[in-house]
């Protein structure tokens, strides 16, 4: 689920007993409301309906978490540079994800970048969690 809202800003100059409107702007702001594990799991299931192995990988990597309970990005325990539901590593992938216009810190962006990795490299980027999802490898398309 994605919600959108408007933010109106007005800059006002109140010097010398005058009020002058300097500028006014309106921005459309979109925020993802997918915060809970269940909602993330549902989103992963729909997004990777054609690649069920990725649903297993998301569970094994993060237990379907994009965010911690305090709302901060979920980071890996072994490597805190692994972020989000697919534990995309900042060191290896942040620059490329930014070049592609993908924000790996959002649910949608993390899934989109995981799709990119899967389509270009198969399940290899998640080989460290293979003991968890490897029994389901027959679900893999690549």
Where are these regions (language model features)?
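N-terminal, intrinsically disordered, polar/charged segments of Gram-positive cell-envelope systems
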Residues: 4-35
């Amino acid at each position: 689920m994605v919600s959108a809202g408007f933010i109106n800003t007005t800059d006002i100059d109140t010097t010398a007993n005058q009020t002058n409107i300097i500028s006014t702007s309106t921005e459309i702001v979109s925020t993802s409301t997918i915060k809970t594990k269940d909602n993330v799991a549902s989103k992963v299931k729909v997004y990777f309906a054609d690649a069920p192995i990725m649903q297993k990988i998301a569970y094994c990597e993060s237990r379907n978490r994009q965010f911690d309970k305090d709302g901060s990005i979920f980071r890996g325990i072994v490597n805190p540079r692994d972020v989000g539901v697919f534990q995309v590593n900042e060191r290896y992938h942040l620059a490329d994800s930014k070049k592609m216009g993908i924000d790996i810190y959002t649910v949608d962006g993390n899934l989109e970048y995981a799709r990119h990795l899967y389509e270009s490299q198969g399940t290899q980027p998640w080989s460290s969690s293979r003991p968890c999802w490897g029994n389901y490898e027959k679900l893999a398309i690549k």
